[in-house]
Amino acid sequence: QINDSNILILGLTFKENCPDIRNTKVVDLVKALEQYNVNITIYDPYVDPQEAKKFFGLNCLNLPPNNLSDELFSCIVGAVKHDAFRGLDIDSMLKSNGVIYDIKGSLVHYDKRL
């Protein structure tokens, strides 16, 4: 069930390891998921949160990964292949029955991938 789920999206930029959010397709993903009444958290260490808000009306966190582990997510989406995501402790952020949708193949958790 996707309704009312907490979803973490890793990455918002147009391409990996750069701050450019112009022409990003991640916004399309966010808009599609919002139709299901989900709670979306976007984390991208390269994005200026004010720019994400200004251009797309999205809240984007640029907090260090360890600050995200207080909340458990039903789904984690690897949307951009930033080097900064390699060391993330995905298991500590994911519910026990949660899933990982790894669009870019950057998250190494084969047992929970869709």
Where are these predicted regions, by residue range?
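Structural/interface elements that position substrates and couple domains in central-metabolism enzymes
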Residues: Q1-L114
